[in-house]
Amino acid sequence: MNLLTIFNILPLGEGFGFNDNILETNIINLAAVVGIVVFFVGKNFSILLENRQQTILNNLREANQRASEALERYNQAKKQLELAEKKAKDIRQEGTLKARQEKENCFNQYKLDLVRLEEYKQETLQFYQQKAFQQIYVSIVSRALGEVKQKFNKPLSEQFHATINNFVIARLTEYNP
């Protein structure tokens, strides 16, 4: 066949072209289109898939790393919490102990103050008793001296004079050198 016959077979104006109606295309045209698409797009698609796979793997690695960091921070926070709870418990116990000691110290100080106050009270009472006794003693002695003075100022009676002489004689007879 020559070239003219081929041109004569083909209707004018139709020529080679792409049939865009899929239902009218045959399997060969469809296979050719799929082959061309796979050939040109397949490489780009496989590159895109590899890039996507690499991105997903990187994201998984980063997620695992962040998860391990988060777990490590969680463990550190847990340790810090336990340490803080232990310190709080120690502080609470120490506070309770100090409160007890302070209470006991205050109670002991109160007892000592009561003892000192009682001693001071006794000393004060004793001082005022001694002062009162001294005043009474001074009063009695001054009265007695006053009465003696009055008796000396009065003339002595015979009976009193005889009593004194008898007393002095009795004392002298008792005296043995």
Swiss-Prot record:
UniProt-listed InterPro entries: ATP_synth_b/b'su_bac/chlpt
Membrane topology type: Single-pass membrane protein
Chief localization: plastid
UniProt keyword terms in alphabetical order: ATP synthesis, CF(0), Chloroplast, Hydrogen ion transport, Ion transport, Membrane, Plastid, Thylakoid, Transmembrane, Transmembrane helix, Transport
Molecular-function annotations in GO: proton-transporting ATP synthase activity, rotational mechanism
Top-level division of the source organism's lineage: Eukaryota
Membrane-crossing segments per the record: 22-42
Subcellular location: Plastid, Chloroplast thylakoid membrane
One of the record's GO cellular component terms: proton-transporting ATP synthase complex
Pfam families in the cross-refs: ATP-synt_B
The keyword Magnesium is annotated on this UniProt entry: no
Keyword GTP-binding: no
Family per record: Belongs to the ATPase B chain family.
Oligomer status and interactors: F-type ATPases have 2 components, F(1) - the catalytic core - and F(0) - the membrane proton channel. F(1) has five subunits: alpha(3), beta(3), gamma(1), delta(1), epsilon(1). F(0) has four main subunits: a(1), b(1), b'(1) and c(10-14). The alpha and beta chains form an alternating ring which encloses part of the gamma chain. F(1) is attached to F(0) by a central stalk formed by the gamma and epsilon chains, while a peripheral stalk is formed by the delta, b and b' chains.
PANTHER family: ATP SYNTHASE SUBUNIT B, CHLOROPLASTIC (PTHR34264:SF3)
Misc note: In plastids the F-type ATPase is also known as CF(1)CF(0).
Reported function: F(1)F(0) ATP synthase produces ATP from ADP in the presence of a proton or sodium gradient. F-type ATPases consist of two structural domains, F(1) containing the extramembraneous catalytic core and F(0) containing the membrane proton channel, linked together by a central stalk and a peripheral stalk. During catalysis, ATP synthesis in the catalytic domain of F(1) is coupled via a rotary mechanism of the central stalk subunits to proton translocation. Component of the F(0) channel, it forms part of the peripheral stalk, linking F(1) to F(0).
Name of the featured protein: ATP synthase subunit b, chloroplastic
Taxonomy of the source species: Eukaryota, Viridiplantae, Chlorophyta, core chlorophytes, Chlorophyceae
Record gene name: atpF
